[in-house]
C-alpha cells in the first residue's frame, strides 16, 4: 500500500471502530435496563433493538444513490451527523419511546455501503481485500471492547451515559472524515450522463451476478443470528457458565482473523481464490454438522464455532471485495448500499426467525433448518456464478 491507501484504510478502520463501539455497548445491557425506562416492556425493548436495522434498510440505498450523485465524503458526514442526533435523542428523552426514536435516527445514518464504495474508489484493486479485512478486524475489536466496557460504564455512570459517549465518538468520527479522508471525484457522474434513478437501482437488485452477492451476505447474517440464539444455550447445557462465554468468543474471533490475514498475504492459488465463496459455504455446512453432533461436548462446540467464525470472516471480506471488483465507479455507491441493505435484512429476518423457530422447534430441528438454508445458499451461489462488469 502507498501512503494515501494506508491513510484511508486506517481512517475508515477508526471510523468503523468508534461508530460501532457506540452501537455495540448497548447490546449486553438493554434487556435489563430497558425495563426500567418509562413505558418499557419486552415488546418495546425488542422494537428498540430491531428498529436500528429497519432504518438501516430504509436509508442504505438512498444514501448510496446520493453518494453517486454527490461527493461521498459529504454523504458520510451527513450520516454521522444523523447518528449523532440519534444519540442525543436517546440520551435526552428518558423513556422507551425516546430510545426507539433515537435508535431509528441512529440507523438512518446508513453509511456502511457508502464507506465501502469510497474505500473501493481510493484503494487499488490489489490492495482492496487487505483494506476490507482491516475494517473487518476493527468491527471485531469494537465488539470485544463494547461487550466488556458497556456494563462497566452503565454501572458507574448510568444507562444514558452510553449515548452521550456514543455522541462524542460520532463527533470524533466527523473530525477524522474532515481532516484525514481525502475528497474523491471518481464516483461523481459527469454532467452529460443521466443520473440513475430508482428504476436503475431495481435493475441492479435483479441483476443475477450482483444478486449472488446480495443473497450471500443475507444468508450469512441470517445464519449468524440463528447461531447466536443457539450457542449460549448449548454452552450452558455443556456446563460452561454464561460469565465465561466471552472468553470463547474472544479466542475464536482472534484466531479467525489470524487465519484470515495469513490467507490474504500468503495464498497464491488462483483456483482457491476464485472459488473461495463456495469453499467457505461448505466449511459452514461442515461446522453445522459438528455442532449438531456435539450435543454436550464442549470441545466439539468450540471447534464448530471456530470453523464457523473463520468461514464467516472470510465471507465478510471476500463477498464485498469480489463484488466491488466488478463495479464501475459511477454506480458503486448504489450497489454497495444494496449489498449493505441485504446484510441488515439478513440480521433482521435471522433474529425474527430464530425467536419464532425456537418457540415450537427443538434444538435438532432448528439445526436441520439451518442445514437446509446452507444447502439452498450453496445451490444459488453455484447457479448465479458469472463474470460481469458494469
Curated annotation (Swiss-Prot):
Keyword annotations from UniProtKB, A to Z: Cell membrane, Membrane, Transmembrane, Transmembrane helix, Transport
Transmembrane segments: 10-30, 43-63, 81-101, 134-154, 162-182, 213-233, 246-266, 272-292, 298-318, 341-361, 363-383
Coiled coil: none
Record carries keyword Cell membrane: yes
Protein's membrane topology: Multi-pass membrane protein
InterPro entries per UniProt: MFS (IPR011701), MFS_dom (IPR020846), MFS_trans_sf (IPR036259), MFS_Transporters (IPR050171)
Domain of life from the UniProt record: Bacteria
An example Gene Ontology CC term for this record: plasma membrane
Subcellular location: Cell membrane
Listed GO MF terms: transmembrane transporter activity
Family affiliation: Belongs to the major facilitator superfamily.
Designated name of the protein: Uncharacterized transporter BU466
Amino acid at each position: 500500500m502507498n501512503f494515501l491507501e494506508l491513510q484511508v484504510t486506517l481512517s475508515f478502520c477508526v471510523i468503523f471502530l468508534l461508530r460501532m463501539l457506540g452501537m455495540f455497548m448497548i447490546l449486553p445491557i438493554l434487556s435489563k435496563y430497558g425495563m426500567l425506562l418509562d413505558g418499557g416492556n419486552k415488546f418495546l425493548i425488542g422494537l428498540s433493538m430491531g428498529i436500528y436495522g429497519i432504518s438501516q434498510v430504509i436509508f442504505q440505498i438512498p444514501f448510496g444513490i446520493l453518494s453517486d450523485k454527490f461527493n461521498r465524503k459529504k454523504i458520510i458526514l451527513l450520516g454521522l451527523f444523523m447518528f449523532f442526533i440519534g444519540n442525543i435523542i436517546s440520551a435526552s428523552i428518558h423513556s422507551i419511546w425516546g430510545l426507539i426514536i433515537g435508535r431509528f435516527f441512529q440507523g438512518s445514518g446508513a453509511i456502511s455501503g457508502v464507506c465501502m464504495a469510497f474505500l473501493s474508489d481510493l484503494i487499488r484493486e490489489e490492495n482492496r481485500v487487505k483494506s476490507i479485512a482491516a475494517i473487518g478486524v476493527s468491527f471485531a475489536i469494537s465488539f470485544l471492547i463494547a461487550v466488556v466496557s458497556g456494563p462497566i460504564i452503565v454501572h458507574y455512570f448510568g444507562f444514558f451515559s452510553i449515548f452521550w459517549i456514543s455522541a462524542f465518538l460520532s463527533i470524533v468520527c466527523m473530525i477524522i472524515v474532515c481532516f484525514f479522508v481525502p475528497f474523491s471525484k471518481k464516483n461523481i457522474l459527469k454532467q452529460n450522463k443521466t443520473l440513475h434513478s430508482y428504476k436503475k437501482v431495481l435493475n441492479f437488485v435483479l441483476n443475477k451476478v450482483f444478486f449472488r452477492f446480495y443473497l450471500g451476505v443475507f444468508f450469512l447474517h441470517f445464519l449468524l443470528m440463528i447461531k447466536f440464539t443457539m450457542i449460549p444455550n448449548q454452552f450452558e447445557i455443556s456446563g460452561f457458565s454464561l460469565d465465561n462465554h466471552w472468553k470463547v468468543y474472544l479466542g475464536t474471533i482472534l484466531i479467525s482473523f489470524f487465519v484470515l490475514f495469513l490467507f490474504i498475504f500468503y495464498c497464491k492459488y488462483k483456483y482457491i481464490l476464485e472459488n473461495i465463496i463456495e469453499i467457505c459455504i461448505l466449511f459452514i455446512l461442515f461446522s453445522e454438522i459438528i455442532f449438531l453432533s456435539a450435543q454436550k461436548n464442549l470441545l466439539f462446540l468450540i471447534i464448530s464455532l471456530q470453523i464457523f467464525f473463520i468461514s464467516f470472516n472470510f465471507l465478510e471480506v471476500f463477498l464485498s471485495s469480489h463484488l466491488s471488483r466488478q463495479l464501475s465507479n459511477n454506480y458503486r455507491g448504489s450497489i454497495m448500499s444494496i449489498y449493505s441493505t441485504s446484510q441488515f435484512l439478513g440480521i433482521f429476518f435471522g433474529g425474527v426467525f430464530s425467536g419464532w423457530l425456537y418457540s415450537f422447534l427443538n434444538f435438532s430441528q432448528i439445526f436441520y433448518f439451518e442445514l437446509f438454508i446452507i444447502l439452498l445458499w450453496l445451490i444459488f451461489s453455484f447457479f448465479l456464478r458469472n463474470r460481469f462488469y458494469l
